[in-house]
Amino acid sequence: MARLNRNDPQLVGTLLPTRIEADLFDLEVDGEIPKSINGTFYRNTPEPQVTPQKFHTFIDGDGMASAFHFEDGHVDFISRWVKTARFTAERLARKSLFGMYRNPYTDDTSVKGLDRTVANTSIISHHGKVLAVKEDGLPYELDPRTLETRGRFDYDGQVTSQTHTAHPKYDPETGDLLFFGSAAKGEATPDMAYYIVDKHGKVTHETWFEQPYGAFMHDFAITRNWSIFPIMPATNSLSRLKAKQPIYMWEPELGSYIGVLPRRGQGSQIRWLKAPALWVFHVVNAWEVGTKIYIDLMESEILPFPFPNSQNQPFAPEKAVPRLTRWEIDLDSSSDEIKRTRLHDFFAEMPIMDFRFALQCNRYGFMGVDDPRKPLAHQQAEKIFAYNSLGIWDNHRGDYDLWYSGEASAAQEPAFVPRSPTAAEGDGYLLTVVGRLDENRSDLVILDTQDIQSGPVATIKLPFRLRAALHGCWVPRP
């Protein structure tokens, strides 16, 4: 990386690249790590290994997988590049060969037809596999301990979709993994593929359908009997790609569509409901009661990324604020509208839950929160990826319990670890990486969910800074 534009808002603060592959044995710990925390906290971070081209976005950096391995009160850290086909080509060339975000028509001719995914968004674990994934391609399998890249993963040839969401859903009752691929037949196509994979890695259900219009889709929801697909007006366009323009455009005049499909239904059975133009990056949980479906999610008025707008309006950050919201869908109603209720006004994102209680009406959710009563150490461009606080949302009280990370600090997406396999919902610990911006390094903090406001029970210190990650997961030791 010979040159780096340090005036680029996507390359400063918590977003400043580090590009560090590391092996750290027995990290320094302040406090005491709870004995029940034995396993691995995996994270995935976009890291540009070469200087990005002029028209770039933070979410297009190469995948950098990292892992905190916990064992009997000790923690080791490891980070490795996800060695995709794209990473390998640019490593050999020592320069950027891939152009605009998800636009192959802007690439160097030497990489025409090469798999463009950077596998940088999430780490998932299922049927003994650890996978790095981004929604523009198929996952890459990693070694669970060393994080070395094993290769592109298509479920042993069972998955023919060209893409795979970074937010598959795990059913704790059956062990099934449910996921979709959008633009499943290639960039800017309206095709959706939907799969169910059993706990042994066998595809037990597959169906295809088309979106009402081709659109960017990031997350979805499942209940015991239904899968729900939100289609929102961040549209894609092959003609825009060929004209070497950004792939996405915000077209609010199209409104939003919510597809409701029986969990093992065929694409022809999907029912499309309507909603106004809005945006949802992430779902907390969904459940059903009788003929009603409830979905807790993070909703904003517009797409939080400043892609072009069909109405030529400037990007409005105040409309891009995600807030905890509940959707209610009545399947017995003749109306094609959904009911939407805002649960809280604070900026909040990157939600997780106690996944043992998925598919039922959960009490608790855990997420990054910007508490407006406290100072912010991060800038506008960082606001989807870093937060001044962590929050525990309590559906019974209708409010957050908050932990403030500090005046020169920024917390990231948490992971939840139950206190024991049989612990009550939400009883356990939150793990989160915190950037110490004034020290140019990071900590991993452990918070007790029973008393989050008292601060960390343990702080694991890193001697360098970790770039803001997107998503990860906790995997207990067998």
Curated annotation (Swiss-Prot):
Q: Describe the temperature dependence.
A: Optimum temperature is 30 degrees Celsius. Activity is lost above 40 degrees Celsius.
One of the protein's GO biological processes: carotene catabolic process
InterPro entries (UniProt xref): Carotenoid_Oase, Quinoprotein_ADH-like_sf
Q: What disulfide bonds does the UniProt entry report for this chain?
A: none
Q: Which domain of life is it from?
A: Bacteria
Q: What is the effect of changing H282A?
A: Loss of activity
The protein depicted here goes by the name: Isoeugenol monooxygenase
